[in-house]
Amino acid sequence: MLDSIKNRHTITSIEQDSLKSWLRLILLFTIGVVGTVGMWSVVVVMPAIETEFNIDRGKASLLYATTMVGFGLGNFLIGKVIDRFGLTIPIIFETFILVSSYLTAIISTEFWHLLILQIFMGTAAATFFGPAMADIGNFFEKRRGLAVAIIASANYVAGAFWPLLISSFLELNNWKDVYFIIAIICATIMFPIAYFLKNNIANNIS
């Protein structure tokens, strides 16, 4: 009961629906589009991976299945971490995991290596989906529904954006080169955004 009262007091003390709230929305939307790349890149490069490891489509589809396993686990596990530590630390950690997974995939010599890495990519994608929606709800009151809907749409915008971009990269590069480019893009965009998101509501709850 006391925790509930304390949390309500903290939320009402935030300047909701302000310019800072909308800025946070833009940052979370951007990181949602970029950070969920792991759910979509594997779909585009799957034919190239089939050729690389001499496997059929059925076996290659396990890559997407393991991504979804990671996504499901991530929404639960990372959500609990964010409740305790706030949004910034998990975003920095999962960005590091995401970038490392892409770079490690480049030097992978066995198909099962990629399966494990896709679990981590799925977990990272989850960090920038459900928890981000929960976070932005604390910074809006009048436009809360709209704000949450915009953050939710980031994953689907990513589904339209990334396959087109990756397909164009694959026309000139192999899948490993594309993964390296993705790693650089994620690191360049997401680490700075994590810095600007440091004033998360959970960090202010004592």
Predicted region positions:
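Helix-loop-helix hairpin linking two adjacent transmembrane segments in secondary transporters
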Residues: I151-A202
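Extracytoplasmic
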Residues: L23-R57, N75-I78, W162-P163
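Short hydrophobic/small-residue motifs within alpha-helical transmembrane segments
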Residues: T67-G72, Y156-V157
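Small-residue-rich segments within alpha-helical transmembrane domains of MFS-like 12-TM solute carriers
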Residues: T36, W40, G122-G130, Y156, ...
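Cytosolic juxtamembrane N-terminal segment immediately preceding the first transmembrane helix
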Residues: M1-I31, G35-T36
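Intracellular juxtamembrane helix-capping segments at the cytosolic ends
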Residues: T127-F140, A147
